[in-house]
């Protein structure tokens, strides 16, 4: 019995492709590594220039839980658990482990309404201004590489719109991109699979991720491109009687020795494996200019090449016996290259498509305005090494070798993104550093019925993974008249004029929960 599975291309594939044999035995796969194995633990550094960052979207069920309360503020037991967690405001750090300077920090949440692209004012999120005074008590000047961390996904880079100033002058920065900040898991109820993304759900997840400095140290490394040889089959020049068969499908079938060959795919909607014959079938709806589908279609073979393949057209994506049709054709071009080169070509095509047809990719298309193909490619290679078929233990989400989801999620998953710049603190003197960006809140979904539809949550970490020695920290709220504070462990009391408070650097975490004040209407 043929085991067919539906790739995660929701709404695109015929019912005949839905999972029919979940109990089929697991297939053994070889583990493919880069020749430069030492590079596997290193990260990518983006090119110089101003960067743009944002958070937003579903973050997974989590908490904006507080630590011990001070300043007569609420404690952890009073904090709200949010359905979508946006991550905390993180402190400035340096690439140097012992920078030799002290720091005073002041963090402000500005609740001025934000004007959206349509011109409407929205009381959603806050502008964060995170300021530092660095003091050099030594008898020599100290030059530091500053790393300002922001939680976000690459797809959101335009909306956060951060800036860093040094001594009042806007600094040129490099964007340094960290790994995916979350993990993988099942759907609950005893499901032990790793099919689903599990975003960080509370501040302690970021504490576990960043504590000890390994994440930051990895970020500052350099990644070597994947130079392993591959054979690429590119499919073009599509033809089919789509007027008669609107879901006309092209299938390519072959057999491989799975201990010697691994196949990655892009642009294919269907996959099947016949456990009796060992035949593997990849299929795609023939592009007709009407259906939303990718034009770029590739099979990337790592290891032993295919010994042959057959092409067959079908009425629809089910690819069932008896539903073969004539008139379905394509051109298949075979080429030999490296994994890096084919992924780089794919990244160029994806980013070009995002620019030409942003509606197809939605919010992901914003990445095309920020990310260059070379950086995108290195991030995709890194994801393949960590979670895909270049990993010792691929997660279920990516173990099919389908690159479509992996390439999209490289752009969308939450990470810690660093703005990198340099500063010299003169002997006996100071340097002032200010980072500013828009911060999305944690929230509950409007349709959840939780009763917290308009509640917004914000978190702040005082010293997490910072190399700086803090001597003082304070926090403030600006334009607090626009919001009502419903929960906190900070100590703000705007109604009585308390809009700035001292923080305890020894307390790792502070939280703030607000609701917009309803506006009077005419």
Give, region by region, the residue ranges found by the protein language model.
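Lumenal/extracellular ectodomains and adaptor appendage modules
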Residues: 53-522
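Secretory targeting signatures
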Residues: 16-23, 49-57
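Generic structural microfeature
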Residues: 1, 5, 39-40, 127, ...
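Disordered, charged N-terminal biogenesis/targeting segments of membrane/secreted proteins
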Residues: 1-29
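Internal signal-anchor transmembrane helix that establishes type II topology
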Residues: 27-53
């Amino acid at each position: 019995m043929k085991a067919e599975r539906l790739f995660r291309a929701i709404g695109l594939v015929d019912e005949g492709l839905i999972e029919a044999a979940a109990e089929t035995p697991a297939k053994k796969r070889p583990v493919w590594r880069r020749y430069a194995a030492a590079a596997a633990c290193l990260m990518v550094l983006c090119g110089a220039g101003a960067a743009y960052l944002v958070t937003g979207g579903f973050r997974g069920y989590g908490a904006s839980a507080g630590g011990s309360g001070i300043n007569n503020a609420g404690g952890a037991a009073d904090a709200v658990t949010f359905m979508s967690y946006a991550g905390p405001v993180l402190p400035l750090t340096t690439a140097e482990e012992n920078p030799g300077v002290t720091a005073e920090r002041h963090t402000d949440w500005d609740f001025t309404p934000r004007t959206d692209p349509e011109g409407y004012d929205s009381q959603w999120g806050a502008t964060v201004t995170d300021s530092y005074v660095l003091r050099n008590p030594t008898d020599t000047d100290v030059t530091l590489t500053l790393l300002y961390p922001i939680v976000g996904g690459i797809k959101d880079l335009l909306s956060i719109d951060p800036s860093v100033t040094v001594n009042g002058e806007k600094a040129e920065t490099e964007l340094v991109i960290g790994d995916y900040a979350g993990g993988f898991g099942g759907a609950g109820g005893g499901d032990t699979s790793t099919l689903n993304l599990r975003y960080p759900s509370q501040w302690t997840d970021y504490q576990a991720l960043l504590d000890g400095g390994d994440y930051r140290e990895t970020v500052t490394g350099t990644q070597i491109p994947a130079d392993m040889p591959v054979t690429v089959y590119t499919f073009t020049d599509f033809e089919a009687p789509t007027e008669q068969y609107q879901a006309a499908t092209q299938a390519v079938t072959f057999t491989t020795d799975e201990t010697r060959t691994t196949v990655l795919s892009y642009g294919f909607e269907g996959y099947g494996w016949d456990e009796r014959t060992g035949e593997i079938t990849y299929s795609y709806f023939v592009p007709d200019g009407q259906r939303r589908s990718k034009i770029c279609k590739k099979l990337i073979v790592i290891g032993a090449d295919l010994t042959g393949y057959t092409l067959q057209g079908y009425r629809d994506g089910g690819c069932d016996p008896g539903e073969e049709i004539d008139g379905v054709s394509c051109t298949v071009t075979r080429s030999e290259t490296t994994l890096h080169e084919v992924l780089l070509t794919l990244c160029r095509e994806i980013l070009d498509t995002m620019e030409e047809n942003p509606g197809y990719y939605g919010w992901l298309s914003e990445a095309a305005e920020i990310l260059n193909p070379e950086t995108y490619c290195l991030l995709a290679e890194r994801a393949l090494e960590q979670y895909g078929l270049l990993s010792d233990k691929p997660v279920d989400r990516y173990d099919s070798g389908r690159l479509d989801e992996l390439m999209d999620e490289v752009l969308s998953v939450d990470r810690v993104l660093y703005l990198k710049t340099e500063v010299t603190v003169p002997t006996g003197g100071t340097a002032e550093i200010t980072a500013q960006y828009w911060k999305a809140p944690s929230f509950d979904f409007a349709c959840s019925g939780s009763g917290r539809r308009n509640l917004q949550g914000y978190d702040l970490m005082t010293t997490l993974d910072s190399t700086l020695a803090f001597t003082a920290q304070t926090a403030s709220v600006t334009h607090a008249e626009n919001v009502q504070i419903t929960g906190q462990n900070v100590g703000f009391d705007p109604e009585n004029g308390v809009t700035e408070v001292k923080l305890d650097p020894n307390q790792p975490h502070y939280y703030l929960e607000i609701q917009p004040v309803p506006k009077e209407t005419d």
